[in-house]
Amino acid sequence: MEKIVPPAVRIEELRRILREHEYRYYVLSSPTIDDFEYDAMMKQLEELEREYPEWDSPDSPTHRVGSDKTEGFASVRHDRPMLSLSNTYNYDEIGDFYRRVSEGLQGAPFEIVAELKFDGLSISLIYEDGMLVRAVTRGDGIMGDDVTANVRTIRSVPLRLRGDDYPRMLEVRGEILLPFKEFDRINAQREAEGEPLFANPRNAASGTIKQLDPHIVAGRNLDAYFYYLYSDEPLAENHYDRLMQARQWGFKVSDAVTLCCSKEDVYAFIDRFDTERLTLPVATDGIVLKVNAPAQQDLLGFTAKSPRWAIAYKYQAERVRTRLQHVSYQVGRTGAVTPVANLDPVLISGTVVRRASLHNADFIAEKDLHEGDFVYVEKGGEIIPKIVGVDTDARSIDGRPIVFTVLCPDCATPLVREQGEAAYYCPNAEGCPQQQKGRLEHYCGRKAADINIGPETIELLYSRNMIRNVADFYALTEEQLLTLPGFKKRAAAKLLDSIEASKARPYQAILFGLGIRFVGETVAKKLAAVYPSIDALAAATSEELVQIDEIGERIAAAVLHFFSLRQNRELIERLRLAGVSLEAETVSVPVSARLAGKTVVISGTFEKYSRDEYKAMVEDNGGRMAGSVSSKTSFILAGSDMGPSKREKAEKLGVRLMSEEEFLRLIEE
């Protein structure tokens, strides 16, 4: 008998799930479900809240817009909220949209403008007297990040408007994108440098525009399309003509924009781009429909989350059927073994797909995969497409179930699986060639030792037995390099110069490059801030490590395990003898200990001092800064417009919110 879940319980469960996915999508830019699943859960929650209004709550995901606002940029309030659009997936719901618009306009005729829905980062540009003065991300819809310096590097963004008939004050909204060709180039470069790949062009665009160095942004060739204009001064009489006006002023407006006089025109537009979108140079994830007349838009107004005069139509992810040839396995630098499906080549979203992710052993068992199975594959933006189903009716009687390997595919060592882990690992860290080469590539990455060497050269050096661990780089000689195929004196000198320069890399970069399990770039910075030398970190206890914000028992155990191994201690000594930086250049000395042992989070905007000045005050008084709220947070220095997610988590954990005045009194006592 199916268990009946009380409405109140289901409502809270949906809110919890949606909040988690909003955080992963909007804050981490790392979604774990697709838009279709998210929208289905959101619709279910909206229906339950309508049916049971006594369980409605102002902090429900149905009453808010997600946030992509990050620390490190000035927060700016939008003159007009940047709201999201309601989504629909079929023609019946488009018909419902037409009905609602008609009722809202009391039967008056209206036109619809159909546009492509670009899949990038929403941006608001402010122009004064034809000059770009500010660029702000969507953020939480109310507040966003000032990324003007980065946006100025995008060549499709006009710094000065063309002509002279533009209004004195103008806001233009659009989408920042990374073209597919540029995405492939950047990922190829990152792979060669041993850096993690971007999952999709949207993540890459978002990560790029939030870089603190505009030079990095300029080197990634972002693009931008624009789709809405605001001004208190007169503009063209309707939305379509305003887009044409924007094009004349120098903005990039999609050629696909179409004026539709009927539902049939809209359906024809959707059908057309169901296939044409697959050949576009940038990512799209649907169609946007807008009422054309601004006066009618004003009459229809807004809900708490979205305009009533616009809606988004989302295409289903492209799904194809192909044959699973066999399963191969890859070994990462940490020893994790990942299964990969090798497929009969098939065309998906304009690219030929030969492989698909199988995640782990549990996924293979859950799908009950057999050799030679016909599988359904989707490519929803990931680098490697995913298998979403199996055509069991087409299964051959000779097909054998796929059993996850018990041996490392590279060194034949029996695999292990730690309790609570989904992945199997090869424990032969020092003898497994793939792990060794993976660690060498990781160490040379731009955010680590930054040695200018590609995986092909590392493979060559490894095959000649010239390198086995990262300390071996510092023992290489010109004579050795000149024995390699294709290496001349100039190439050898360039590599040796890069290796020499890596000795001066910051301590936290070298710590990251050591490849300690679970110690990524951010964790390495946190560890280096508390333990300003490798020796101090090696002497730390588990109890001390877990006191650091966002350092849990798992990370602490990995750090302790790394330093417990003799070969790692010997590696560190070799790096020290080679002259590699293993301690911070300077250690800041607090001017007081009023905040000693306190972990502080800063959120919002302030009147008396800037965020950076308050961060300096915390550190000068012996406190430690953290970017997110946790059970280890001592208090939050809360300004106006504090982020809703931080406020919600603070209330849940009972973390104190401290005002500017309270904080200044505290450090002046």
From Swiss-Prot:
Keywords: DNA damage, DNA repair, DNA replication, Ligase, Magnesium, Manganese, Metal-binding, NAD, Zinc
Any one GO biological process: DNA replication
Bias-annotated ranges (Basic and acidic residues): 61-71
Annotated EC: 6.5.1.2
Record: residues binding NAD(+): D35, F36, E37, Y38, D39, S84, L85, E115, R138, E175, K290, K314
Gene3D superfamilies per the UniProt record, alphabetical: 5' to 3' exonuclease, C-terminal subdomain (1.10.150.20), 6.20.10.30, BRCT domain (3.40.50.10190), DNA ligase/mRNA capping enzyme (3.30.470.30), Helix hairpin bin (1.10.287.610), Nucleic acid-binding proteins (2.40.50.140)
Residues the entry annotates as binding Zn(2+): C408, C411, C426, C432
InterPro entries: BRCT_dom, BRCT_dom_sf, DisA/LigA_HHH, DNA_ligase, DNA_ligase_AS, DNA_ligase_CS, DNAligase_adenylation, DNAligase_N
Cofactor: Mg(2+); Mn(2+)
Cellular component, GO, one term: cytosol
Residues at the active site: K117 (n6-amp-lysine intermediate)
Xref: CDD domains: BRCT_DNA_ligase_like, LIGANc
GO terms, molecular function: DNA binding; DNA ligase (NAD+) activity; metal ion binding
Catalytic activity of the protein: NAD(+) + (deoxyribonucleotide)n-3'-hydroxyl + 5'-phospho-(deoxyribonucleotide)m = (deoxyribonucleotide)n+m + AMP + beta-nicotinamide D-nucleotide
EC class (word): ligase
Job description of the protein: DNA ligase that catalyzes the formation of phosphodiester linkages between 5'-phosphoryl and 3'-hydroxyl groups in double-stranded DNA using NAD as a coenzyme and as the energy source for the reaction. It is essential for DNA replication and repair of damaged DNA.
PANTHER family: CHROMOSOME TRANSMISSION FIDELITY FACTOR 18, DNA LIGASE
Protein name, UniProt field: DNA ligase
Gene source species: Porphyromonas gingivalis (strain ATCC 33277 / DSM 20709 / CIP 103683 / JCM 12257 / NCTC 11834 / 2561)
Gene behind this protein: ligA
